[in-house]
Design a protein with these regions (language model features):
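SIR2/sirtuin-family catalytic core signature
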Residues: 1-19, 33, 43, 254-336
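Metabolite-binding pocket within alpha/beta catalytic cores that recognizes anionic/polar moieties
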Residues: 19, 127-187
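Short, flexible loop segments at the rims of nucleotide/cofactor-binding pockets, characterized by
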Residues: 123-132, 248-255, 280
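Extended hydrophobic/aromatic segments used for targeting, binding, or gating
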Residues: 160, 164, 168-201, 285-322
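Short secondary-structure boundary/capping segments
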Residues: 22-35, 167-172, 205, 290-291
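Covalent nucleotidyltransferase
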Residues: 139, 187-191, 208-218
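Gly/serine-rich nucleotide phosphate-binding loop at the start of the catalytic core
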Residues: 1-149
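Acidic, metal/cofactor-coordinating or nucleic-acid-engaging core segments within structured domains
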Residues: 56, 208, 214-268
Length: 336
């Protein structure tokens, strides 16, 4: 019997984009421009559309956030807000600034956006299409292969489509920080998730808080549930896109990141690493670098799945590793 090996998978937004493309929902679920559906996202108190509006997000709106912006302008505004939030923990006092208020609005908006997206698309109705998707085949193969000891998936996505996919095909998994037992497939979510629930507030009392986004919280303040989603958490466990989770100093995220670092350091040259759909923006690459730099440089099986991989990430991989392969989609994953 061949010696068992481990598989480390790092998933970015491209994984979810590919899934929506596979089931024909890319037009309804816009993951490239997070403001595009803002006028349709319901305000939790009233459940009426218009979360992204001057009425509900006056600070984001004042900074230029609009549902009709193109994705480049939308990303520019998000990066401005997050860059200010990243620097904030270095100050002893939080001042009442528009970018800080906008950050709170952005975090609450993203929670509502991804809950809205999840309710809008029932992936179980696309089981036939997903059965033939490269990622589904690959994950099923890994789970069934006795030569694979562990499959560690680091997901930088808030959504629960990965978990719902595994549930749909009866593939066991566990969630780091929440599961009492560790399955062969173990998922780490250092950027948080809409499935991380805290104490709930009454719907009629819903509002955007002034400070909760920056207060420190621990993993044991949350529970995991990917089926019963809502937007009524008193505390949201989300690090907005382009946010540096290490600088925002959230204990729940730090615990998960530390587990990933230890995991990356234990990889051997005969193990496999798969990187999919990672943007590698300048404000979030520090976290990714932390994981990559812990891996052995002589690892034999390193694959990046991305139709348009960032050149700067290519440069980093060439610097850190002796070899790697780039493939445009998941079709050939099982052959590598």
């Amino acid at each position: 019997m061949a010696s068992q090996k481990n598989v480390f998978i790092l998933l970015g937004n491209g994984f979810s984009i590919d899934m929506m493309k596979t089931i024909g929902k890319s037009d309804e679920i816009n993951l490239n421009n997070l403001f595009a559906c803002g006028a349709d996202v319901p305000w939790p108190e009233t459940e009426t559309p218009g979360f992204l509006s001057f009425q509900n997000c006056p600070n984001l709106w004042t900074l230029g956030a609009r549902p009709y912006l193109d994705k480049e302008l939308a990303l520019e505004i998000i990066e401005e807000v997050i860059t200010c939030a990243n620097i904030l923990p270095q100050r002893t006092e939080i001042k009442d600034k528009i970018y800080i208020r906008a950050y709170n609005e952005l975090e609450q908006y993203l929670m509502s956006l991804f809950v809205y997206y999840t309710r809008k698309v029932d992936i179980t109705k696309a089981k036939g299409k997903l059965k033939s998707w490269g990622w589904t085949k690959y994950l099923r193969q890994l789970n069934a292969d006795s030569n694979i000891k562990t499959v560690s998936i680091v997901s930088l996505n808030y959504d629960v489509w990965l978990e719902n996919l595994l549930d749909m095909f009866s593939i066991p998994y566990s969630i780091d920080g929440f599961s009492s037992t560790k399955e062969k497939i173990h998922i780490y979510k250092p950027q948080g998730s809409i499935a991380f629930h805290s104490t709930k507030r009454d719907r009629a009392a819903y509002s955007i808080p002034d400070r909760n986004s920056f207060d420190n919280h621990k993993l044991d303040e949350f529970r995991y549930d990917n089926k019963n989603l809502d937007c009524l958490n008193i505390i949201n466990a989300l690090i907005p896109p382009a946010g540096d989770s290490s600088r925002l100093k959230q204990s729940w995220s730090a615990d998960i990141r530390n587990h990933i670092k230890v995991l990356a350091k234990t990889l051997k040259k005969d193990d496999s690493v798969v990187i999919c759909g990672v943007s590698y923006w300048h404000v979030d690459r520090k976290e990714i670098d932390t994981y990559l730099s812990e891996m052995p440089s002589d690892i034999k099986h390193l694959v990046m799945v991305n139709p348009n991989p960032p050149e700067v990430l290519n440069a980093v991989l060439m610097t850190l590793f002796d070899q790697y392969v780039v493939i445009p989609n998941s079709t050939n994953l099982m052959k590598l």
